[in-house]
Amino acid sequence: MSSIDYVQGTDSLKVSCRMEFEDFLKDLQTIDDDRNLRRSFNQQPFPSDLINQYFNSKVFIYINGKLLIGKLLSADLDGNDINLNLIYRLNKKPKSITVRNLILTGWYTDQTNLMIIRIDNFEKGIKLNPEHNEETYTIK
């Protein structure tokens, strides 16, 4: 489950993602199978460069047609889940948003990625999967 929230007055989006930690490690291996990932994630703080690389290769957010790059704010374990919070800087107020989510789509054919997008008065819940992994919306 992920959420994308426009933060008023800061020209940024805050993106939160919660997923099972074991699935996260498995999916992370698709971009970095050279490291002992379990050892890397047994230590705090988590390796932010690796999480940034992972998230930016799996979740693509375009505002007004421009691809944004996320930067990790925090990563926390909560039981069997990992919570990731990232920030995306904008240069203009959003008029359109395109989201592509590829998290776990290479592993599970029935994977569904739920996302909530909140920008000003616009709020939309979406389901993305391996065959339908992208949505575009105009913000009014």
Segments from the language model and where they lie:
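N-terminal soluble domains immediately following signal/targeting peptides that reside
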Residues: 1-140
